[in-house]
Amino acid sequence: MRCLLSLILFSATVAAAQQPDPDQLFSSAVDAQQRGDYDVAIRDYQKLLQLQPKMGDARANLGAALAHTGRLDEAIAEYKQALETAPDKNAVRMNLGLAYYKKGDLADASHEFEDLQKLKPQDVQLAILLGDSEVRLGRGNDAVQMLTPLEAQNANNADFEYVLGTALIQAGARREGAAKLEQVAKATQMADAYLLAGSTYMDLNEFEKSRIDLEEALKLNPKLPRIYTLTGMARDRTGDPVAAEPAFREAIRLNPDDFEANLYLGAILYKRRDVDAAKPYLDKALQIDPKSSMALYENAMWRSTAGQYDEAARELETVIKSDPDWLEPHVQLATVYYKLHRPEDGAKERAIVEKIRADQQSKGPGK
């Protein structure tokens, strides 16, 4: 019995001697984290937390190391646990919000940032993160209300102005938002800002401004999504189809299923009377979006030129049903009816054309 007891005591002594020192583990983990050796840092923090599971700083640091390696779900779990014992809970909540943000869980990120922003209403980085989260959640009005009081002291902060500009556009103040994005783009040469400003001006039918911004975006970053399509549209709408054509061809090379690039290129070739070359692009556009009024209209124009008047009439009638106030389909349908020897139908369409024109003159420029 005495021999067995001594063996038990000896085993306990050896185990105690082999137990890692928590201070050394913490120091080793911090050193590894600071030099970017996150795998070692994670290993040492995990060992330490097996010994001292309520050590909040270590758990928060483990969350940060996991986040750096892209293990965001694990990082989030560690941050949540760290909130129970960490001395600086606000710092942990900030990191938790950032982990949600990087993961794309914007609702939870916004919740964390919003609570922190109430405690630190002048913190510009926090405001930027919250504002961007709100915009990406479709809550542009909320972002504008939160950011606007901070603008005076942050007007030279490009990130702040970019987020405010995107929020304004989403909230309906599109010209003001686009102007802010232009200022950011000129100051920072940020291609994304030029792209969003240019596409916004296009939506506002301000095509010259749109083209200037989109051309700059294309120069800065030709890999931006849809940049060739948008630039081609701006060139075409400023009366430069020759310059638009290569942009659309490049867009189709990058994405053969680009609806607008196929539609616009087909229309350019049709207007040039290169009808055989136009047909595959117009067909492709209609295949991509069979319900598109524009695609149906352009195909109807091709059919009319090719002498396929019955098919052209059917497509124009479909367009008019979906958009009865669009003038040009009525004009073309009247012409097609006369070619089909349907003068009564042609006369009815002519009367509709005159009515739409009169309405447009009373209201201002229309479609």
Regions found by a protein language model. Name each.
Residues Q33, A60, A64-A67, M94, ...:
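Position-specific recognition of the canonical hydrophobic site in helix A of tetratricopeptide repeat
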Residues L51, T85, L119, A152-Q153, ...:
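Structural marker of alpha-solenoid helical repeat scaffolds
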Residues D21-K47, L51, A64, H68, ...:
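Alpha-helical segment of the N-proximal tetratricopeptide repeat
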